[in-house]
Each structure stands twice: as C-alpha cells, then as structure tokens.
Amino acid sequence: MNNYQVKAIKEKTQQYLSKRKFEDALTFITKTIEQEPNPTIDLFELRAQVYEKSGQYSQAELDAKRMIHLNARNARGYLRLGKLLQLDGFDKKADQLYTQGLRMVHKMDPLRPVLKKVSQRLNERILRTRPVLDLFRILPREVLLCILQQLNFKSIVQCMQVCKHWRDCIKKEPSLFCCLDFSCASPRSVNSRDRNVMAVARYSVYSKDNIQEVIGLEKLGILTPTKALLRSVKSLKVYKTISPLHTQSTDKLYTIWTPFSELHYFYCATPITFSIASKILSCCKKLKQVELVDLIPDLIFDSMDWDKLFNAESVPLALKSLTFIRNQKFPFHHKEQQFLKDLLSASPYLEYLEASYQSDLVAAIKKYKINLRSLIIIDEGVSNTVKDLAFLPQSLTTLIVKPCNPASTILCPYLFPTNVRMESLINLELFLYLRLSQNDIDNVVKFLTSCYKLKKLVLHDSLALAPHFFEIFASLPELEHLEIPDNVALQNKHAIHITDCCPNLKYVNFSNSISLDGSGFIAVLRGLKELKRIDIINCDSVSRDAIDWARSKGMQVTVASSLPNSQPLGTKKIRLI
C-alpha cells in the first residue's frame, strides 16, 4: 500500500468522524485492514483513533499495542498507547511506557522530542499529585530534628522542596542553617548568581543571623560578601573555599573574607598571593586555624606591603594552627622566607605548623621560642644540600617529614638533633633519602634511639637503616603503631626482634618486604598479643595457609591494596644523578 492509498483512506475516515458516523468509520477501516495482506501501523493508528472517539478504549489499546509490535522504533505507537492509558487513569503504566519508548525509539525519529516532552509533563504531574507521607505531623519535633541534623545541607534543601509544610517546618529550626555547605552544588548553579544570592539571604534569615560555617560559596558564583552574610558577620567562625575562583582582579580577593572579623578557622584551596594572605590575617585577628594550601608569589615581590604587618612588637595573632604551602610552579623568592619568619614571630601561641621547608625555619622556631606540638615539613626537592632540623622544641609530640608528592622521594638528607632526648615525641613519620651516607645514617639512628617514648613510627625508604634495626627497636619499648613498607632487607630475624622489643604493637605494616616469609609472619602473630591488624601487601613468600590461620584467629590481614588500579607502594619516581 503506497502513500497515496493511505492518504485517501485517512481522508475518508476523517469524513466519517467529522459526521460522527463512528460505526461506518469503524466498518470501513476494519474492512481495509482485513483486505490488506500486510497492514501498516498507519491503518491500526486510524482504527485506534476511531475506537478512542467512540469511547472503546480497550479496543483502541489493542491496536496501539499492535502498532508497537509492528515497529518498536517508531514513537507513534507509544504516544497513542500512553494517551489511552492516561484516559483510563493508569498514569504509572503510561509513565513506564514512555520510559520504555525513550529507550527504544530511534534518535532520528521526528516524534521523539514530542515523546520526551509528554513523558516529562506526565512525570511532573505524578510528582505533584503523589501523596506525601508527612513525617512532620507523625514524628515528634525532637526526633525529626535529630534525623535532619544527620543529613548534609544539600539533603536538607531537597527536603524543603518536598512540600510547603515541610519547608515551613524546616525553616523554623535555626540550628539546621548554622553550616551552609555548598560543596555538592551543581557546576551549572554558577550561572544563577542572583538567585543564589537570594537563597543565601533566606538561609541567613532562617538561621536567625547565626551562620557559623560557610563551605564552597564560590561554587555559587558569589565572589563578594552578600548582604545575607554581612548580617551574620559577628557569628561566622569557619570559611572554606574548595575550588578555584575565576576572577580577573586577584588583587581584590581579600575583600571576600576580610569583613568576617570573627573568623576562627579559614581554609583556602584557592590560589592566593602572599599579599592577600597577609591582609586576611591582619583583618581577622581572631583566627586560630589557617590552612593556605596554594600560595603563589605576587607579581612584583619588592612592592609588597606585608613586610611591616607582622613582627615581634606587633599585636600577637591568636593562631594555634598554620598550614603554609606554596605553589611549586613558581620560583622561590627570598621574601617568602621572610614572610613566614615574620608570621612566626607574631604567633606566640602556635601549636601546629605544616609548611614547605625553608632554611631558617628551625632557627625562627628556636628564636621566637614557639612551643610547637606538631610539625609537618613538606620537602619540595628544590635543593640537594643537607637540610637542618637540628633543633626541635621539647614540647613536640608529632614530627612528619614528607615529599610534596607521595610518589616521589626525598632528594637530600635531613640533619636531626642527637644531643637531647626527645621525651615528648610520640608520633614520627619520616621519608628518608635513598643515598644516605654513613654519617647521615648514624644521625638518623641516634635520633630514633633518643625518641624512646614513641608510640607511632612510620619509616619510608628505610633500606639503609636495616642493619641498625636491632639497635633502633631495642630503644622503643612503648611502640604501638609501626610501618616499614618497601624495605626489601627486612628479614624474619628483624621481625622477630621487633616482636620481642615492642610487645605493645597493635598495627604493623611490612608491605613489599619480599624477604619476609611464613615463619616470620607466624612468629610476629604469636609474639604480639595486642596485635589487631597487619599489612603484608606483595609479601609473596607468606603462604595462603598462614594468612588463613591468622584470619581464623580474628586477625585483620591485608594482602592487597584497597585502591583501584594503584601502583605498588615501592614504585617511586627517582631522579637519576
């Protein structure tokens, strides 16, 4: 049957329908279908239309199903059957049918956009008419408040969109809006800046102007303090940026944060210059914890005005924790060193410091008598000369020396103090230089033996220390956490000696120690009564039977990395000399 014949049949059928002669139209189209050896979906669509006009929905649905059966890639059958199901009151079945149609219909079908639009419209109508279980009328307020406080901020906003009653109840709880966390905001939300400003203004009203924490506000495209946040300046104590700020005027970035004079904690993942950092620190006098993880130099270092902001005679800062990490893509300038030195001189209460290594860092700590409790040194690998850590505060409980990139190695040895006993040091993590000289080895060994109260020890790239393991661990009787990964020289005798000297060990990591076999593994398990977990990743000499025996005793044994597609722990980037 060609297109002209189909067109003639349609015109004659429409004539019957216009005169409301449903029986004549039905007889005509049915006779045509019976006479046609291979009826097309056009004929069944015409008859379904006639059935629909005459109110015979069940018969019309059968013809619509025949249309889908004849050509499942054509949208007309799904549109016809979906409409009939809705007329019969089966909205859910129609919704499922439209979903199936969107999967099956060809992308080039001209009616596919119509099918998609009809599906979306039906879905919206189902959501509007769907009965909502009103938990706010069933559960007590205290129970609901406890539940909502476990949700993240995005989930709370979604709950407000369920219905008007939910929104009215939630916005009456100021405690739910003390922390505005926009870290889950969609990247597209930056395009709706004005709407976002109004939303933040509403949250400020809901919180009774008591917002205490803001996270990721830059994801909403808001680069300056809004009126909503300025209302709550007196209460804002935590501000975190988690993504870069795309702005032309980087020299004006400090205006975003300086109005919040009551800030206690400031975390900035946004690249900011030293001048901006100095203005923030000088304006927010009550800052106790600052994390600057991507500091970049000013365009013209010599024109910076921060060199007079901090010194020993200025008003001391309230800082207790400082993370000060520079961006390595930019060359080092001597004024960066002076900036950190001045900052330390104005921070007498500092207890935690994480910073890129600088030559006079230890001298500044000693000069200004800073009683640090935790010191983390980031080695940038810029210089190959020996780096001085010969002075460490007696108040220090945690010391970490690590490379800027976990997959890299330390490019030079560190000089540790050996003339004093580190009585307060409890946690120690060291990445060692791979080519230690004998003097450097002696220095590290003396330092480790002086830390006799250590409870946690992590040694990376410790191959050079293997001959001294007996001396080192004999001095660490209180050790509870030990990690010596990537040491191919670690043998059964060393493991047994560690077991005898450190009976309180609860966690041990011997990963990539290929010389350790099943007998040494069993000896460690039997000797350490407090042991709860042991890692032996890539220790192929330890048999499966020994591992199964350990697990049968309730021991947690890790034999494979939990990170997908991760490289072996011993694989490092080594700069060849």
Swiss-Prot record:
A part of the E3 ubiquitin ligase Skp1-Cullin-1-F-box (SCF) complex. Interacts with cul1, mcl1 and skp1. GO terms for cellular component: mitochondrion; nucleus; ubiquitin ligase complex. SMART domains: FBOX, TPR. The keyword Transcription regulation does not apply. Pfam families: F-box-like (PF12937). It is found in: Mitochondrion; Nucleus. PROSITE patterns: FBOX (PS50181), TPR_REGION (PS50293). TPR repeats lie at residues 6-39, 41-74, 76-108. One of its GO terms (biological process) is negative regulation of mitotic cell cycle DNA replication. Residues 138-180 form the F-box domain. Has a role in substrate recognition in the Skp1-Cullin-1/Cdc53-F-box (SCF) ubiquitin ligase complex. Required for the maintenance of telomere length and transcriptional silencing at the telomere. Also required for chromosome segregation. The keyword Amino-acid biosynthesis does not apply. PANTHER family: F-BOX DOMAIN CONTAINING PROTEIN, EXPRESSED, IM:7136021-RELATED. This is F-box/TPR repeat protein pof3. It comes from the Eukaryota.
